[in-house]
Amino acid sequence: MKIKKIFNQNAVLVDDGGQEKVAIGKGIGFDRKRNDLIFDRDIERIFVMEPEGQIKLQNLLNQIDERFLFAAETIIDHAETVLMEKLNEHVLIALTDHIAFSAENINNGIVIRNKLLREIEVLYSDEFSIAQWAVEYLTKELGIPYTYDEAGYIAIHIHSGRSGRNNNHRSIREVTIISDIIHLVESELETDIHSEPFSLNYSRLVNHLRLLLQRTHAQQYAVLDTEIVEMVKRKYPESYKISKKIRVLLTKEYQLAITKEELGYLAIHIERLRSAIVQTNVNNHEEEKN
């Protein structure tokens, strides 16, 4: 293998039989120049990607310490073992960049809170569990105090790297929309629905919203008889009113349209939550009297 480009003293671009690869090794680029030979004994890790990914990785290695790349690789290996599936190659670059960027913020005393953390934990529970492990690993391995909020961001990267899943932008958009809806529901019901008495109904609502968004994206809408929708409107007027406000939010802020059937289905889930809140308030009142 011959050196084509030196990124830093521990990372170089090599030509291996006409194929470009990124080679990592302690001191591999030190006191070397273009066309110098590199041997297997010099290499700790080697990365082969599609041309676009290779260029992005090269640009990244020009700017960051390669230990962030190694850490991201370890997290991905762990994720693939737990999930029993391969992640796409692009997640390595995105996760490396994120870990390095977060480290810079932390070292500068900047802590970015993840306002979508609760929704991410419910929507992507498998990925979130892996991300929690990753936060502990990063803190120990790099000596940088990554926060619990970081698990949410890492979970999104892992989710976007899974085969056949949404890309990172779409995953974040999905969580953001659901978070906005949850805030609207909390405002209407005047209750923190994340709290313990309502955790099950909260999880059910979040999962329903995820499926609703997926159906809307695929234009495969829920089937609900017109009679059932009308019954829901009569029987659960408050919840149906909230579902209509959600439709306005989706249309105005995200240019998403949902059908009357989806509206009725959503109202049923909101009513389940609203009823739980009412019952909890009654129980609390009874306890206060006693």
Regions found by a protein language model. Give the residues of each.
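A cross-family "folded-core" feature that marks the main globular domain of proteins
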Residues: 1-290
